[in-house]
């Protein structure tokens, strides 16, 4: 059986590119090139049309009159950024020499549900560090692991050490709030510690043509158990809206594992494998090209719901308590 998309080295980076027709290096030429790149290669048109009425042809008609040969580069960049914001996709960017166009509404329009100051209270100063993981035992004998970015590498030895250290705990909390993604291999590697058998965790498709719905058949994503130490006790994964991309995939995997509960806010999503291209002016463009789904073949582009939706309350915050962590601790009693 295949490992989970072993050919993806990094979800959230420029991981492939496409060849494009030749357009002139003018505001009009760059606009036409940009619109065409997305028209032929972006993967969520039909899904987002159903979700909120996205019409890419209407987007063309809306923005085309705004481009003229008298525009400055800054003006061209601004209009292009506004056009791409219609896609509501955190994996969509334009990289110029002076700015990066991005859409962060997937977390900026929602409560943060995370606090660095509260995290310092829970972690203290005597926590341990194993590569990208910070961990300790809380005073009620619950193991606590903080993983802030899947860009931070972890090795099998690191995971063995952490799980061995926390082996006598009654349960385990994995806090990935504010983790906006990184290396998908790290997400798979960590999730593999929480299943004793190979399991189906989702599906992926690939673009096969230039039509909006030209895709391959769905291919299975399967998670194999680690050959190292595996955790057999209850696990709670903490999430908020800033959980995105590879971190969103990790939540998808963990929802398929036994004894796992997701607590916090809906994740930010980001379920398209990003590809890249280039405009005539030399600016790089990134976009979602390969859609990924959960094990029920449902899109996770706009996020994954937790098992328990919990938010940090003002009263708890002022009292030095993280409502989400405190709720998670009650699940082990």
Cite the ranges covered by each PLM segment.
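Bacterial Sec-dependent N-terminal signal peptides
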Residues: 1-24
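Flexible, low-complexity junctional segments that flank or bridge functional domains
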Residues: 17-206, 212-220, 234, 276
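C-terminal "post-core" interaction segments
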Residues: 18-39, 74, 141, 180-333
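Alpha-helix termination/capping residues and helix-transition junctions
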Residues: 11, 166-168, 229
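Flexible loop residues that form catalytic
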Residues: 9, 177, 243
């Amino acid at each position: 059986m295949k490992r989970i998309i072993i050919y993806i080295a990094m979800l959230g980076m420029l991981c492939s590119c496409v060849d494009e027709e030749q357009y002139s290096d003018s505001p009009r030429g760059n606009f036409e090139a940009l619109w065409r790149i997305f028209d032929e290669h972006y993967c969520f048109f039909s899904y987002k049309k159903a979700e909120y009425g996205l019409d890419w042809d209407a987007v063309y008609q809306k923005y085309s009159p705004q481009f003229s040969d008298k525009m400055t580069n800054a003006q061209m960049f601004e209009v292009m950024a506004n056009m791409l914001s219609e896609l509501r996709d955190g994996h969509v960017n334009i990289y110029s020499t002076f700015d990066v166009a991005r859409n962060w509404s997937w977390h900026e329009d929602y409560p943060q549900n995370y606090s660095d100051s509260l995290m310092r209270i829970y972690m203290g100063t005597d926590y341990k560090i194993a590569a990208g993981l910070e961990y300790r035992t809380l005073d009620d004998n619950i193991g606590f692991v903080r993983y802030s970015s899947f860009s931070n590498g972890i090795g099998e030895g690191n995971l063995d050490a952490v799980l061995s250290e926390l082996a006598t705990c009654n349960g385990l909390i994995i806090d990935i709030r504010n983790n906006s993604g990184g290396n998908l291999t790290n997400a798979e590697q960590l999730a593999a510690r929480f299943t004793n058998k190979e399991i189906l965790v989702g599906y992926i498709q690939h673009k096969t043509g230039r039509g909006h719905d030209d895709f391959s058949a769905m291919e299975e994503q399967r998670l194999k158990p680690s050959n190292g130490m595996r955790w057999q006790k209850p696990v709670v994964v903490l999430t908020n809206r800033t959980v995105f991309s590879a971190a969103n995939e990790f939540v998808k995997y963990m929802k398929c594992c036994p004894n796992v509960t997701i607590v916090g806010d809906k994740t930010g999503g980001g379920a398209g494998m990003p590809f890249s291209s280039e405009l005539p002016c030399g600016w790089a463009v990134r976009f979602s090209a390969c859609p990924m789904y959960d094990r029920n073949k449902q899109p996770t582009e706009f996020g994954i719901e937790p098992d328990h939706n919990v938010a940090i309350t003002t009263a708890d915050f002022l009292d030095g308590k993280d409502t989400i962590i405190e709720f998670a601790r009650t699940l082990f009693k």
